[in-house]
Structures are given as C-alpha cells and as structure tokens.
C-alpha cells in the first residue's frame, strides 16, 4: 500500500469523482447558510440538506466535496485520546436522483483499491441486515468473499433523524491486523476493538419516514457518502493517531518548538500539546470563515477553543501570547487547499492575538476573584471551595480547574471536584439537548413546505414599482387557505411581484395590493424557500381568493430612500477597503429607508481622521455622478470583473453584479439608485465595536442627512447663545470652561480633605471600647471613596489598635470603609465579613481582606442604620 500525504489524498478523491462527472464543490464555510438548526457545519452533507429535501436545486445531480467541519460535543476528550479532534475534513460524494447503490459501491471499491491501492483482502464491508440489494452488489459484482460482508442492525447501518429522508447504509472497513484485535474468533466489523477501522460510509437515502413511522419509498433516491480525511490518512500512513498524520504532525512539531517541550515526554505534556495543535487548527479555520470571539453561539465556541489552547500553553510554561505566531504553520499546511487562509492570514493572526491578550487579562481577573473568595473562606474557617463556585470561575471567567486546585493547595485547601463535575455534566446535558433538538429542526415542515414545489415567484421590482400578479397561495395562522377577508393578517404568494423581499441586509418592501372591491396593506416582504416571495398582508377591505389577479404597488418613497442607503453601503464598503485595508470584510448590514448600518471586520476603532477620509471619499463618489449598472454573469465572470462577494454567502452559477462606475463592483441582489448623485449626501453618525474584531458604522443619506445636519446646526447655535461665543471661538471657550471647572473641583476636594483632617481629633473622641477593643464608627456627610480610605488610614495610625468603620454619601450612593489593625485581626476580626453585613442594610454589597474592606450601597439614607450594627458585629467576631 502506497504511503500518501493528507493533501494528496484530498486531491486524488476530488479528481477521481470529477472524472466520474461529479461537480466538485469547494468546501462551504463553517457558518451554515440560512440554517438555524446548526451552530456550525458538523458533517459533509450538512450544507446540502436543501438539495436532498428538494427545497433547492443542486448545481449538478452529481457532486463531490471536501467539507470543513467542527464538532465540540466531545471537547473534553480532545487531547486525552489519539482520535478525538474538534476540526476535521469530510470527503463526500453525492447523487440527487441520479445513480444509486451499484455505482456508489463500485466507485467506492475502485477508489479504495485502484487509487488508494489498499489491499483488497484488507477491506471489509457492512450492510444493513435487511438490505439484500447492497449485499448482492458486494458479493456478485465486487466479488467480495461472503465472510468479509457483515450484516449489521439498524443502530449501525441505517441513517435517520426523526422524520424525513432516511435509508440503509454500507460501510467500508480496513483490517489493521491481529495486533489490534480483541483476540475473539468472531472479531469482525461491529466489534468494539481497534482492529477494524470504518473509513467510508455510503448512505442510500431511499425512504421518507412519516410521523406515523412508515417508511415510504422516495421517487428519486439519493446517495450520500462520507469519508473522514484524517481517518483515511491514518490508514494510508500506517499511524495510530491523527496527531501522527503528516499535516497534524507538522503543526504539533511547531507547537513543541514554541513551548520548548517534547512530544511523548509524559502524559500531561502530550495532552496539552494535542489540545493546542487541534484547537489552533480549528480557530484558524473558524476565523478564516468569518467567525469572531464572543460570549454566545459560534463565537463562544471559538473563544472557548482559543482560551483552552492558551491555558494549556500556560501549563507548559508559556507566560505570554503565542498562538497567533503559530498560525502561520496552519496556513503553510492547509493554504494550498483553502486559499482564504492565505488571503486573510494577517487578519486571522490579529484576531487571535487580540483574544489571547484578553485572556491574559481574564486570568488575572479570575485570580483576583478567587483570592478574594479564599479570604472569605478563611474568615469562615472553611477549607473546601464548593464546586459550583469553581465551575463559575471556569465557565464565566475561563479560569481552569487545574489552576484553581493548585492555588488552593498552596493555602492547604481543596475543591469539591464531584460538585464541579456535576455542574459540568449539567452543561454537557444542556449542550446535548441543544444538539438533539437542532438536528431535526432543518427537516421540519410548515405550511409553506407543504405547498406545491412548482409555486414560485418572479420578481419584477427591478424594472417597476407596480405589477399584476396571480395569487398562488394564502397562509393564515400557519394553515393554507383558499379565501380570506377584511381584518385578517395573512401571508400570500404571487406568481409575479414588484415587492422586494428582505435579503442581503435590505429590508422588505411595503405598499398596497388591490383589485375591484379588495384592498390590502403590505406590511413586510420576506424571501421564502424554493424561489417564493412572501408578502405579509393586512386585509383592509373585501375578499381575496387563490387564483385572483391583483395589482401590487410598492410605496415609492421608502423604496427610493432604501435604494439610496443600499448604494451608499457599497460605496462605504469600497472606501473602507481602500483606506483601512483589504482585510475589511462585510460582517453584516442593515439597509432601511431611514439609515444604513454596516458591520465589518477590523480589530480596532477607527480614528476621527480615518472616518473623515472615508466619509469624504464616499461623498466624492456621490458628486462624481457614477452610473449604477447591473449585469447578470456567471460566478467566474463576476470574479474576473473584480466583484466583491460577501463571505459565507451561497451563490449559484449565475449571479447579479452591481457596478457603481469604475469604483465599486459587488455581487448583490438588492435594489439601487440609477446614479450615485441620487444619494445626495452621506453622513457617518457613529462608529462602534459590536464584537471582538467587528466594527459598526451607522450612517444616513439624502433628506435624513440634511435633517441631521440642521439639528446639529441648531444645537451649535443654542450653545453659542448660552456661551455668548461665535463660530471658531466656541471650542476654545468650552476648553476654558472645562479647565475652570476642573480647577474648582480640585479646590473643593482639597477643602473637603482639609476639613476632614481637621475634624480627625474631634472624631477620635468618639472611640468606644468593646470587649477590650477600640471601635470608632463615624458617618460623614459627602465624601468620595478615595477620601474615605485616606481618612480611615489616618485614623488607623492615630488609634494604634482597634477597628474603624466609616460611612459617607457619594454620587447619591452609600460608601463604606472598614479597617482593622493587625493585632485585632489576630483576635478574629475580619473587615470584609463585617462590611458585607453593613452594606446589605444600605442595599449593597462588597467585601475584602481581614484588615481592610470597602463596599457600596444604593440607599444613602440608610447609612446611619447600617453603621449602627457594627458594634454587634464586632462583639460576635471577638467572641468567635
């Protein structure tokens, strides 16, 4: 058997199926397109679901892919075993109502034996126990000996998820030999030992399972095969671990160099090295596909993987950010097959670095919180940290349990690991439920799915704002009806419509539909499946029936304002790329009649100078009166024109190209002005961050821009009037006022501090002796927390021995400060525990060390009541 590299196997597979007249589809992004049932693409067939269900038409009846996938369900096992990984590539061949079992099995056998050159006697096959057809193909056409064809039950060899398309499958196994065997005479595929490795699953989707559990034959059966690239590479390279495959080994070696460690040194080191290697690959691909770190959804998955890898770097002794430097190794290894990694290399590296640096801060934050909690435990004479708190540190702050245990051991403390594991299991169960609930979501039907697939809509809104259309369907309360009447809110599908459906960030059109005695208000328009456009209608008068011909008219002003903003968005996108950098990618947009919102990839806020440059450039192109033209072209032709495609968007063979002069070329299905001069004026309102590595610009055009400028002018005139200053002198006058105010505030603070210090001797007269310990409690009027601490420290020096509890009002809130001398702390006094009870009465909380603590409260009127309990708290602490 010839030894082959992973990249070589990938190319060989795709070339083989291209020869078999399959359309070779580049890997879809890891972010599912229009599929809310999945967080991330986790299987080769996942992006093709709509082709299997018939909702969308595939580019060819035969397809082949090498699909990027992410699975994190078993993340805790990654690193601990040699086969678990979060990122993997799935080779797949598919047929939609074309060839079936015979060709699928024959070509699978041909590729495995002739192209991969696997020994025939090493390959076994399994079939579903009731699938005599597949068994017969293996026995009679492939001529595989009966003893190497295994019949397995539904659990192993029948693919189904709830209701919908399903069918039997046949799997190819590679026999690794006796040394991996369990030793039993009946050892064969299906055994739990490591001898037989399943490497290629052929699913024959020939049934449609209904709600009653019946398996109905599909009129056009499908083929769905999947072969894990890393797994077959293990076979071809005769290695036991995916981390020994050539591509993974290259990354792992660079991790060893960066961490100054050796692989196979010890178990703990191996686990950390594997985790870093796997997670580095995953995060590079995820960021390359437009995912950014966040606290929810797929962004949280990315953040967790990145921080987990960074944490294992710390366990190996790495004290600074290092993952971003290793990313180049992933690009070197996979860049030939995935060009986006090369194109976005600098951007991916920057995002990793920013997130890594943030994690360093997080570790420090978690450490502070843990240390504070340890002090509280000491005060309560506790020596075991509850597992729920440890899990909160882990889950919320990314603070690892290993580090928590290590810190506790230094204080001769432990953590309740069983309680921690219980919380971890609860989280796993939540994740499993989310996954199991989501897996079938994409196959569920609604009233629209039940409609005839020939019901489609032709959009006429590019050419006209008014068009006649025939009512093909009416949906009322998720039921298909033939008739509806005044007062109802329904969704209708027309054969022709001028109403643009919400798509590509542009909101749907509004307007009216009418005929004779009937009138309806179009509240919204959305894109449905199968080239249908849904109009959301409120029936104002009359009756509407399926089959009626009606007039539809789009409200002109909102549409034209939306077009202004949409074309301006294209100009903005181009200006950002030119001024900020080519790494800028659209990460989201919203185009309404009132404003535009544009989210884009960039790792830091834009300076005022850069924003001014962007705004100026867009306005210059508006003044240049550029013609806006649209052309239909093939995807390849559009790319040759230099058209900007939206990353992650799913495009067909033919696309619509929007050209704004020679300045901007984008793939876009939206509506636009005819000439850039129609936009009028472009004005940026704000630039903010919405997530790590994602910035947002909000802007207005046309009349909205004019009205905004007039409002701003009005405000400036009012300020000029108040300050009795005109024009250019306004800024200077405001600076003078701010300087004067700052100086007055400083003088006021100095006076307050002086008065407070002058009254210290008077305050010392209020000392009481409780159980042989000095106690000084005082309620000031208004003092900042900083002043309260300074006064407390001064009193502490003067008192020599004892406890000081102070309260004051600051910014309409209560502030408390408690401090105790060392000798009193040794008697059992704990300032942090004391102040927590005090602050509760004023509607707040806080804590701190035994010798010093501060807290706040929402109710300043309760400061005196809160301070009144200090005497009792001190007695309790002194008496143990």
Swiss-Prot record:
Q: Does the keyword DNA repair apply?
A: no
Gene name? alaS
Q: Can you name the source organism?
A: Alkaliphilus metalliredigens (strain QYMF)
Q: Which NCBIfam families match?
A: alaS (TIGR00344)
Highest classification ranks of the organism? Bacteria, Bacillati, Bacillota, Clostridia, Peptostreptococcales
**Name listed for the protein in its UniProt record:** Alanine--tRNA ligase
The record, for SUPFAM superfamilies, names: Class II aaRS and biotin synthetases, Putative anticodon-binding domain of alanyl-tRNA synthetase (AlaRS), ThrRS/AlaRS common domain, Translation proteins
Catalytic activity, reaction form: tRNA(Ala) + L-alanine + ATP = L-alanyl-tRNA(Ala) + AMP + diphosphate
What EC designation does it have? 6.1.1.7
Q: Which InterPro entries match?
A: aa-tRNA-synth_II/BPL/LPL, Ala-tRNA-lgiase_IIc, Ala-tRNA-ligase_IIc_anticod-bd, Ala-tRNA-synth_IIc_core, Ala-tRNA-synth_IIc_N, Ala-tRNA_ligase, Ala_tRNA_ligase_euk/bac, DHHA1_dom
What top-tier enzyme class does this entry carry? ligase
Claim: Metal-binding is one of the keywords in the record: yes
Gene3D superfamilies membership:
2.40.30.130, 3.10.310.40, 3.30.54.20, 6.10.250.550, Bira Bifunctional Protein, Domain 2, Threonyl-trna Synthetase, Chain A, domain 2
Residues noted as binding Zn(2+) in the record, renumbered to the chain: 566, 570, 668, 672
Print the domain comment field: Consists of three domains; the N-terminal catalytic domain, the editing domain and the C-terminal C-Ala domain. The editing domain removes incorrectly charged amino acids, while the C-Ala domain, along with tRNA(Ala), serves as a bridge to cooperatively bring together the editing and aminoacylation centers thus stimulating deacylation of misacylated tRNAs.
Q: Which residues form a coiled coil?
A: none
Please share the entry's free-text remark on the cofactor: Binds 1 zinc ion per subunit.
Compartments, record wording: Cytoplasm
GO biological process, any: alanyl-tRNA aminoacylation
Which UniProt keywords are given for this protein, alphabetically ordered? Aminoacyl-tRNA synthetase, ATP-binding, Cytoplasm, Ligase, Metal-binding, Nucleotide-binding, Protein biosynthesis, RNA-binding, tRNA-binding, Zinc
The molecular function terms in GO held by this entry are: alanine-tRNA ligase activity; aminoacyl-tRNA deacylase activity; ATP binding; catalytic activity, acting on a protein; transferase activity; tRNA binding; zinc ion binding
Q: What are the boundaries of the region Disordered?
A: 414-443
Q: What does this protein do?
A: Catalyzes the attachment of alanine to tRNA(Ala) in a two-step reaction: alanine is first activated by ATP to form Ala-AMP and then transferred to the acceptor end of tRNA(Ala). Also edits incorrectly charged Ser-tRNA(Ala) and Gly-tRNA(Ala) via its editing domain.
Q: Which GO terms describe its cellular component?
A: cytosol
Question: What family does the Swiss-Prot or TrEMBL record give for this protein?
Answer: Belongs to the class-II aminoacyl-tRNA synthetase family.
Per its Swiss-Prot or TrEMBL entry, what cofactor is needed?
Answer: Zn(2+)
């Amino acid at each position: 058997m010839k030894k082959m590299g992973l990249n070589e196997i990938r190319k060989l597979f795709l070339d083989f199926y291209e020869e078999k007249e399959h359309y070779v589809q580049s890997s879809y992004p890891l972010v599912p397109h229009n599929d809310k049932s999945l967080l991330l693409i986790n299987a080769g067939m996942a992006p093709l679901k709509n082709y299997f269900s018939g909702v969308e038409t595939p580019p060819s009846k035969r397809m082949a892919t090498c699909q990027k996938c992410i699975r994190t369900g078993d993340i805790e096992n990654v690193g601990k075993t040699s086969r678990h990984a979060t990122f993997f590539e799935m080779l797949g061949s598919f047929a939609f109502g074309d060839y079936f079992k015979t060709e699928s099995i024959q070509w699978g056998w041909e590729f495995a034996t002739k192209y991969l050159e696997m020994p025939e006697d090493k390959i076994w096959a399994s079939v579903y126990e009731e699938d005599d057809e597949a068994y017969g193909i293996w026995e009679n056409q492939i001529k595989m000996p009966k003893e190497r064809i295994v019949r397995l039950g539904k659990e192993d060899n029948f693919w189904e998820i709830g209701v919908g398309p399903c069918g039997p499958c046949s799997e190819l196994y590679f026999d690794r030999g006796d040394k991996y065997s369990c030793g039993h005479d009946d050892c064969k595929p299906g055994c739990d030992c490591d001898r037989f490795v399943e490497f290629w699953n052929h699913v024959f989707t020939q049934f449609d399972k209904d709600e009653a559990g019946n398996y109905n034959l599909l009129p056009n059966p499908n083929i769905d095969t999947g072969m894990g690239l890393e797994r077959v590479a293990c076979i071809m390279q005769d290695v036991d671990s995916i981390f020994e495959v050539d591509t993974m080994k290259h990354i792992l070696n660079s991790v060893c160099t960066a961490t100054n460690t050796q692989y196979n040194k010890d178990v703990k080191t191996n686990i950390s090295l594997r985790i870093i290697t796997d997670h580095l690959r995953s995060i590079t691909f995820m960021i390359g596909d437009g995912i950014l770190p966040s606290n929810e959804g797929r962004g949280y998955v990315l953040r967790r993987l990145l921080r987990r890898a960074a944490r294992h770097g710390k366990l190996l002794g790495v004290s600074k950010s290092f993952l971003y430097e290793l990313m180049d190794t992933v690009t070197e290894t996979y860049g030939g097959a995935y060009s986006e990694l090369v194109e976005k290399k600098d951007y991916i590296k920057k995002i990793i670095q920013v997130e890594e640096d943030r994690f360093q801060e997080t570790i420090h934050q978690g450490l502070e919180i843990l240390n504070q909690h340890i002090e509280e435990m000491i005060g309560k004479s506790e020596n075991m940290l509850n597992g729920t708190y440890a899990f909160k540190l882990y889950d919320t702050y990314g603070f690892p349990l290993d580090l928590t245990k290590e810190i506790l051991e230094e204080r001769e403390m432990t953590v309740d690991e069983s309680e921690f594991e219980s919380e971890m299991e609860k989280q796993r169960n939540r994740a499993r439920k989310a996954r199991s609930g989501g897996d079938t979501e994409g196959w569920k039907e609604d009233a629209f799915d039940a409609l005839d697939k020939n019901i489609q809509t032709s959009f006429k809104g590019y050419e006209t704002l008014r068009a006649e259309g025939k009512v093909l369907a009416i949906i009322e309360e998720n039921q298909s009806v033939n008739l509806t009447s005044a007062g109802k809110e329904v969704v209708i599908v027309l054969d022709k419509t001028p109403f643009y459906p919400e798509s590509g960030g542009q909101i749907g059109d509004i307007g009216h539909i009418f005929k004779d005695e009937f009138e309806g208000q179009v509240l919204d328009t959305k894109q449905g499946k199968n080239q249908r456009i849904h109009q959301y209608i409120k029936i104002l008068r009359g009756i509407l029936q399926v089959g009626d011909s009606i007039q539809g008219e789009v409200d002109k002003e909102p549409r034209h304002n939306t077009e202004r903003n949409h074309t301006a968005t294209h100009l903005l996108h181009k200006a950002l790329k030119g001024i900020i950098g080519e790494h800028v990618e659209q990460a989201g947009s919203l185009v309404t009649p009132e404003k535009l919102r544009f989210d884009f990839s960039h790792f830091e806020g834009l300076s005022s100078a850069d924003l001014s440059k962007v705004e100026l450039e867009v306005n210059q192109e508006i003044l240049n009166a550029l013609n806006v033209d649209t052309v239909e072209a093939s995807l390849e032709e559009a790319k040759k024109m230099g058209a900007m495609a939206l990353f992650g968007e799913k495009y067909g063979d033919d696309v619509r190209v929007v050209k704004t002069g020679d300045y901007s070329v984008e793939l876009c299905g939206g509506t636009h002005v005819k000439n850039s001069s129609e936009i009028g004026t472009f004005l940026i309102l704000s630039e903010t961050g919405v997530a790590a590595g994602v910035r947002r610009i909000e802007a207005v055009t046309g009349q909205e821009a004019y009205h905004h400028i007039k409002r701003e002018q009005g405000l400036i005139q009012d300020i000029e009037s108040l300050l009795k200053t005109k024009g250019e002198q306004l800024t200077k006058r405001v600076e003078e006022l701010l300087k004067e105010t700052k100086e007055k505030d400083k003088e006021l603070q100095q006076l307050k501090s002086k008065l407070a210090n002058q009254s210290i001797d008077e305050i010392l007269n209020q000392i009481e002796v409780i159980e042989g310990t000095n106690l000084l409690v005082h309620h000031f009027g208004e003092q900042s927390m900083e002043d309260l601490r300074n006064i407390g420290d001064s009193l502490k020096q003067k008192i020599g021995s004892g406890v000081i509890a102070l309260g004051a009002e600051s910014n309409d809130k209560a502030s408390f400060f408690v401090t105790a001398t060392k000798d009193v702390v040794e008697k059992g006094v704990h300032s942090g525990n004391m102040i927590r009870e005090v602050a509760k009465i004023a509607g707040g909380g806080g804590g701190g060390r035994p010798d010093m603590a501060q807290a706040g409260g929402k109710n300043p009127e309760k400061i005196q009541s809160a301070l009144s309990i200090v005497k009792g708290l001190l007695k309790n602490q002194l008496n143990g």
